[in-house]
Amino acid sequence: MESGIDDLSRFLIGDRGLALLYGRSEPGIETVRSAQPAGPRTLVRETDGAVRACVYFPDAMIDRLERTPPQQGLDETNVDDFAALVEELDHLLLLGARVRGRRSVSLFELELHANVSKHLVLARFLAGGRGRLGDRRRIWLRHHLFDKHRFTDPHAGVRRRYEEAGRWAVRFLDQLATVGLEQRLGLLREFHRASTAGKLALVERLAATA
C-alpha cells in the first residue's frame, strides 16, 4: 500500500497524547474507531486542503499485547487487541494512500478495507507455518472478528455502517477462499485500488460468477 508514510511511529499517540489533543479542543476532528468501546481510534482533521491524522492506542492495550504478543500465538487473551491494532493501522495507511493519490475515501470504505485486512493478517498469524487455516480455526477467527460484535453506538447510521462493512467484508473473504493464490492476489489488488462503489461491484461480480 503506497501510503507515503515511512515512519508510523510519528502518527501514533497514547493516553497522554490523546489528552493533549482533546485538551486543545480542536474543531472538526473526525473519529474512526474500532468495535471496542472507548478503545483505539483514528483521528482525522482536514483544514485548508491538508489532512492531519493520527492513531490513538490506549496504553493498557499496548501493555496487554506486550504481555501476550500475537507472534507467540493468538487466543482469547489477545485476539481483540491485535485485531483493533491492525484495523486502526489499516485506516491510517489507506487514508495516506488516498490522500497521496488525491482520491477521496469514505468512512464506510475505511471500515470495509480494514475488515478484510485484519482478517488476512490475523489468519496469517493464526496459521503460523501451517499455510492455510483449517475449518476449526477459520470459524474461530470469523467469530472473533465479525460474529460476536454488537455495535452500541448511539447513532443508528454509525451502527449500520459498521454492520454493513462487516457483511460486505465477509462476502468478499468467502469468495477469496474459493480461488487460487494467484487469482486471490489479483483480486486483493483490485479491491484495494477500487473506490467504495468499485469494491461493492467487485463483490457482486464474484458472487454472480460463483
Can you say where each PLM-predicted feature lies in the sequence?
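N-terminal low-structure segments adjacent to metalloprotease catalytic domains
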Residues: M1-S3, L126-G129, L202-A210
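Active-site recognition of the HExxH zinc-binding catalytic motif
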Residues: F82-G96
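Short coil-to-beta-strand
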Residues: G49-F57, A84-E88
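Short pre-active-site segment immediately N-terminal to the catalytic Zn-binding motif
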Residues: I62-A83, V105
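Post-HExxH zinc-binding segment in Zn-dependent metallohydrolases
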Residues: S104-H144
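Pan-zinc metallopeptidase signature
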Residues: F151-A210
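Long, hydrophobic, amphipathic alpha-helical segments used as structural scaffolds
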Residues: A97, L122-G129, A177-G180
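A metal-dependent hydrolase signature that marks the N-terminal structural subdomain at the beginning
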Residues: M1-R52, G73-L74
